[in-house]
Amino acid sequence: MDWGTLHTFVGGVNKHSTSIGKVWVTVLFVFRVMILVVAAQEVWGDEQEDFVCNTLQPGCRNVCYDHFFPVSHIRLWALQLIFVSTPALLVAMHVAYYRHEAARRFRRGETRSEFKDLEDIKRQKVRIEGSLWWTYTSSIFFRIVFEAAFMYVFYFLYNGYHLPWVLKCGIQPCPNLVDCFISRPTEKTVFTIFMISASVICMLLNVAELCYLLLKVCFRRSKRAQTQKAPPNHALKESKQNEMNELISEGGQNAITGFPS
């Protein structure tokens, strides 16, 4: 899957998202995918070739590089973006199933009054409610879990988010404790912090969207409960009308009894 296909796929699901979800997609592709494709690959393109150690012992440089960088930053970022975008597949499958069922009912004549034709069903925006609400919130929850998990993996693999200028390596077959040097460590540290910051922003947006959906459901249920407790409008008007009729009737009887016979 290339990045264009991923953009088309997630962008299609974005039609049915909330406003916060649309902001999340923008941050994902502008500040993460574009940076990864345009700039980060250029910065990390020479990572293994320019990793130098002050020894000529065969195999020492490769072993030290594998020890300090077991997984390439770019490959781990790409894997993170794929995992974070994958939960949108749940929403896409749910929407596709909803449209398939709507089209089937339309052909049977059950929803002729709701849709003009089959194209109208495809253009309709599916509201986030009912079973789709559970699917959508589940996808957001998995996004948050994946973001947090990959941030921890980054910190665990590289002992933090800062790339040092000099690395001390004493692993076999190195003859002793040797110094190893990374190409452009400051530039790579800046990119690492930027990508981690973008990941934090995306995770906060996911948390905000999840809270928004939960509060929206709570407000909707509270409003529904108040509506069920309150008397209907026509019954309230009828009771008020009966009270007015009783008052008028009592006033008329009092006026009649007040005259002498």
Swiss-Prot record:
Keyword set, alphabetical order: Cell junction, Cell membrane, Gap junction, Hearing, Membrane, Transmembrane, Transmembrane helix
Segments in the Extracellular topological domain: 46-75, 155-192
Record-linked InterPro entries: Connexin, Connexin_CCC, Connexin_CS, Connexin_N, Connexin_N_sf
Annotated TM spans: 23-45, 76-98, 132-154, 193-215
Keyword Cell membrane: yes
Any single Pfam family the record assigns to this protein: Connexin
Molecular-function GO term, any one: actin filament binding
Cytoplasmic topological intervals: 1-22, 99-131, 216-261
Subcellular location: Cell membrane; Cell junction, Gap junction
Subunit structure: A connexon is composed of a hexamer of connexins. Interacts with CNST.
Purpose of the protein: One gap junction consists of a cluster of closely packed pairs of transmembrane channels, the connexons, through which materials of low MW diffuse from one cell to a neighboring cell.
Protein's UniProt name: Gap junction beta-6 protein
Organism, scientific name: Bos taurus (Bovine)
Taxonomic lineage from the root: Eukaryota, Metazoa, Chordata, Craniata, Vertebrata
Gene: GJB6
